[in-house]
A protein has these predicted regions:
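PP2C/PPM-type serine/threonine phosphatase catalytic domain
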Residues: 1-223
Length: 223
């Protein structure tokens, strides 16, 4: 989630649901009838409505791909097939930006988690974030692919060095199994920089502990 702009380029995927502007409070119940559960955020960038197109194309591709995953893959096989998907969508977004002047340098970040065959994985490209709240303590799980994170605090925090499309020459996807088992009571939160640029990690922690809702975080970001 993130603060909504007039032209909102963020998009959310929750299994088979796509959301952009609506406020949402959702509970996902895993009834073990489905092999895969997926939640992701893409934060698009580019002129005109190019960012909206990039984030939408990426998440629709991811949803279609996740629904078609074969059962019983090993961790190595799952990681390999996810990387193949990433390479394909990166080429698609980059090509669309090259052949259409109005979509020049269109791109998007991507962050999400996938529950596949009893295992939890997280993925990240860019500076959208995955956090975990456990026992009242907030931890950033993902790593920002930003100039500041790569070269130090003297660099701007809002310049990313990795994205899907966007003319990026070395696009890559972090895809990892969770190191710690997911525990009862854990809260996992995805957000674009539209949230964490407006509110500190400590304030995010306080809001999650106190209220535990997306709407409370959005209100805190606006105040």
């Amino acid at each position: 989630m993130g603060c909504v702009r007039k032209n909102n380029e963020d998009m959310i995927l929750v299994n088979d649901k796509f959301l952009r502007d609506d406020e949402i409070e959702s509970t996902i119940i895993d009834d073990n009838n489905s092999t895969t559960t997926i939640v992701a955020i893409a934060d698009g960038m580019g002129g005109h409505y190019a960012g909206e197109v990039a984030s939408s194309d990426t998440l629709h591709s991811l949803q279609y791909f996740a629904n078609d995953l074969p059962k019983g893959m090993t961790i190595a096989e799952f990681t390999e097939i996810m990387m193949k998907w990433f390479d394909n969508i990166n080429l698609t977004i980059d090509t669309k930006g090259r052949i259409n002047p109005e979509m020049s340098l269109m791109g998007t970040t991507l962050v999400g988690f996938i529950h596949y065959d009893g295992k939890f994985f997280w993925m990240n490209c860019g500076d959208s974030r995955l956090y975990r709240l456990r026992g009242g303590e907030l931890t950033q799980v993902s790593t920002d692919h930003s100039l500041r994170n790569a070269y130090g605090n003297n660099e701007p925090s809002n310049i990313i060095i990795n994205c899907i499309g966007g003319g990026c020459q070395t696009s890559y996807l972090d895809i990892c199994e969770f190191r710690d088992p997911v525990k009862e009571g854990d809260i996992y939160m995805l957000c674009s920089d539209g949230l964490n640029d407006m509110i500190s990690d400590k304030d995010i922690e306080v809001e999650l502990v106190t209220h535990g809702t997306a709407n409370a975080l959005i209100e805190a970001a606006y105040t």
